[in-house]
Amino acid sequence: MVKNKNESAILRYDILVLKRRGVTRDLPSGTESLQWVTNTATLIYGEHDAVVVDTFATIDQNQQLVDWITKSGKNLTTIYITHAHGDHSFGIKILLDRFPNARAVAVPAVVKAMQTQIDPNYIKNFWNKLFPDQIPEALIVPEALESNELELEGHKLVVLDNGFTDTEYSTSLYVPSIGLVVAGDAVYNGIHPYMPETTEQSRLNWIAALDRIEGLKPHAVVAGHKNPANDDNSRYLCLS
C-alpha cells in the first residue's frame, strides 16, 4: 500500500532515564533512597524526524543522550526545554554540536530564567560544587518560541503552561495525536519531588496544573524524574 503524501506518519516516543546523585547532600542516614535521582529525556519521532524534550546536567550523561539519539537513526529537528533548571538544559550545546541542523527552543520566560542558571557565579558556587569537572563549560540558552506549538511530520506538539510546579515557568509538551504528555517537572514518578523553591501557594498551583493535564485524558505521561522500573501510566498524575 502506498501512503498518500498528505498522510501524516504515526508518531511514537522513547525515553532515556539516567541516574545521578541528588542535589541535597546533607540527608541523615537511613535515607539512601532519597540521595539519588533520575532525569528523563524523551524522543518523539515520526518516520524520519524527531524532537527531543530536555537534556541532562553532566557531560557524560549528555554524551549518552547524543549516542542514544544517533542510534535511533532519526533526524533531530528540535530540542525542547521544559523549564530552566540546569539538569534539563545544560546539554543544549553538546547536542547542537552533534546535530547542527537542529534548533533548541523554549518559551520566552524559560529562556529568560535560564540566564540565571548559566551565570558563571551560579555555576561555580552551585553546580560545580555538586558535580566537579562534570558540568559542560559551554552553556547556552535556547531560542524563544514565538507560539505555543511545534510541528513534527504534520503533527502538532502543544506547549502547556503549568505556571509554578517545582520551579517557576514550568511547561509540558502535549502530543494530541498519540495522547502523550511529556510533563517535565510537573510530574514525578516514583521519585521524591524537588520542593525547596515551592511555597504553599505554588504547591496549590502545582495541583491545579496536574488537574489540567489530567483533564486532557492522556494515554501516557512521561515524568521529568521517574523510577526506571515504572511505566508512563497517567495514574502518576495523582501520585505526584
Language-model region placement:
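Beta-strand-turn-beta hairpins that frame and shape the catalytic cleft
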Residues: 9-11, 45-50, 149-158, 175-180
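Divalent-metal (often Zn2+) His-rich catalytic cores of metallo-beta-lactamase-fold enzymes
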Residues: 180, 202-240
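Active-site metal-binding motif and surrounding structural segment of the metallo-beta-lactamase
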Residues: 60-106
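Active-site neighborhood of phospho(di)ester-bond hydrolases with catalytic His/Asp-centered motifs
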Residues: 53-56, 77-85, 105-108, 181-184, ...
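Zn-dependent metallo-beta-lactamase
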Residues: 1-48
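Metallo-beta-lactamase
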Residues: 112-163, 167-169, 176-177, 210, ...
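Pre-active-site segment of Zn-dependent metallo-hydrolases
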Residues: 31-38, 48-78
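Active-site environment of divalent metal-dependent phosphoester hydrolases
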Residues: 59-60, 84-89, 111-114, 166-168, ...
